[in-house]
UniProtKB/Swiss-Prot annotation:
The chain crosses the membrane at residues 2-22, 29-49, 61-81. It catalyses: a ubiquinone + NADH + 5 H(+)(in) = a ubiquinol + NAD(+) + 4 H(+)(out). Keywords: Electron transport, Membrane, Mitochondrion, Mitochondrion inner membrane, NAD, Respiratory chain, Translocase, Transmembrane, Transmembrane helix, Transport, Ubiquinone. It comes from the Eukaryota. GO terms for cellular component: mitochondrial inner membrane; respiratory chain complex I. It comes from Galemys pyrenaicus. It is a multi-pass membrane protein. Belongs to the complex I subunit 4L family. Gene3D superfamilies: 1.10.287.3510. This is NADH-ubiquinone oxidoreductase chain 4L. InterPro entries: NADH_UbQ_OxRdtase_chain4L/K, NUOK/Mnh_C1-like. The keyword Mitochondrion applies. It is found in: Mitochondrion inner membrane.
Length: 98
């Protein structure tokens, strides 16, 4: 296994651990999700280029489109929660609270 693959997997693991540890703030969760998507994008692109999968060459671009949509929805949710409650806690997203 190449050092590049190890670094990408470590980046994904660190982002995932950050998502598990800092899940109380919405902004931290969004940053960790973006780090996970970036490492998956780079890993997918490198694998497709190394194995010459010409049919799957659009997959990283499609994943980037979904990541951009996820970021837009997450930021709009962050703005809505910040304007409503004044803080970016994830616990404010619970619809069962009065």
């Amino acid at each position: 296994m190449s050092l590049v693959y190890v670094n990408i997997m470590i980046a994904f693991s660190v982002s995932f651990l950050g998502l598990l540890m800092f899940r109380s703030h919405l902004m931290s969760s969004l940053l960790c999700l973006e780090g996970m998507m970036l490492s998956l994008f780079i890993l997918g692109t490198i694998l497709i280029l190394n194995f010459h999968f010409t049919l799957a060459s659009m997959a990283p671009i499609i994943m980037l489109v979904f990541a951009a949509c996820e970021a837009a929805v997450g930021l709009s949710l962050l703005v809505m929660v910040s304007n409503t409650y004044g803080v970016d806690y994830v616990q404010n997203l619970n619809l069962l609270q009065c």
